[in-house]
């Protein structure tokens, strides 16, 4: 198909035809010619300024121009054509007059305008004027006009589509900018602009989306914002669609039941995945380290360890995580939120897994059993720790001092010795700790509560670990023995500290003078030398000391213990 030319869109009249038009019709003609010309120029189509254009711009009468060839067969034209598109009676009459004269001059005496009683009866109307479009000469085929604004089309379908633009009702609205359209196709085309631009960009991960609403949803990954709550179980979701899908679980039939534990599922694939828990099968293996998993999602999460990807960052302390759920749990350290409460004793936890394990205390159940020695535990974490007694495996090593640990959590806590980080702060007195357990124990000082009581002697303790240690006094148990010298200890921490005598290890270093110590308590006391603080005060004479050992020695002056020794 050749390029569009000005001749293709021009409407031409003979001199006689031109004289039949009144002033309004001639002005309309001029406007249409000029508009067509400007449209072609705008589209970049080369158009020479013909005499016709020049005359029109100067508002002169146009010269006689050649008319197009007429069709050989005389067409039949519906009179509703003129009535619909040229509603004004004088324009309709002129149209019919000019059309008939043109065909008569070409020798087509049989040309007639067919009269129809209604548009509905007219086959030409019903056919969308397809036949009319094909048989009309150039002049008539360009005469489909929009009566809202002066615009001429060469097909009825184009005119009809154009008229919709002037409809006041525009039901198709853009969610992004609020703009309305009368046709769905126009809205679809408009929305593609957003897809191309991708103007909504996430500041966290630089992901681009084509709608601001999508960006808002995406950001909830980082904020862990969960707006949609299930009325049945109080579970929350960050997208309404997720809540809707979750609600279906209540309504859905669950025909697939696990024969092992009785749990039911609404999909056979879910049951298949669940069964892996009982079989111990781990089909999803990490190519990097060989570790296997029973779920593909767990493997995906694990892979982030190797890539180092940690997209979920805590705004409070800057700590990063590989999973959004881990960040949600971590945030509870700062907020103190403990949503999981034991109905038996009222104790609350920040994790559902902790509550589940805690319940075993009340039931006496110990489901976690060591395959090596048969010892059972009420917590899986206790079993994991116990197993390392048999293996002596310590895979987590500190890069700072080389110390190795059985658990990653222990390494994390240990690192705070070097960094000095103390994220757990007491709201009562402002004292900070590097472990949450230490803060929990410390809080009991303010309440004065000592819930852990010795059945043997009645002595009460703030911490359960202190009671456990105390009981060894009555039992005489000293389970922790040094392999180097054979000395035994009641506590594992005492053995650890003792071992440093043999190794010479001094992990606690003073930043002020560089002096190192084997115990953190010694470093704490040493720091007082630099500050000049003397926190240890004698109750008898108000004399103060910078070390507790010096106060202990001083007290002997008042008790007479030192004098007695001198007399000997």
From Swiss-Prot:
Gene3D superfamilies named in the record: 6.10.140.140, Classic Zinc Finger
Predominant localisation class: nucleus
Entry-linked InterPro entries: KRAB (IPR001909), KRAB_dom_sf (IPR036051), Znf_C2H2_sf (IPR036236), Znf_C2H2_type (IPR013087)
This protein's record includes keyword Isomerase: no
Signal peptide interval: none
A GO MF term: zinc ion binding
The keyword Nucleotidyltransferase belongs to this UniProt entry's keyword annotation: no
Any single biological process term in GO: negative regulation of JNK cascade
Zn finger (C2H2-type) start-end: 144-166, 172-194, 200-222, 228-250, 256-278, 284-306, 312-334, 340-362, 368-390, 396-418, 424-446, 452-474, 480-502, 508-530, 536-558
Alphabetical keyword list: DNA-binding, Metal-binding, Nucleus, Repeat, Transcription, Transcription regulation, Zinc, Zinc-finger
Domain KRAB: 4-75
SMART domains (UniProt xref): KRAB (SM00349), ZnF_C2H2 (SM00355)
Pfam (any one): zf-C2H2
GO (cellular component) term, any one: nucleus
Function: May be involved in transcriptional regulation. May play a role during osteoclast differentiation by modulating TRAF6 signaling activity.
Description of how the protein assembles with itself and partners: Interacts with TRAF6.
Protein name: Zinc finger protein 675
Gene name as annotated: ZNF675
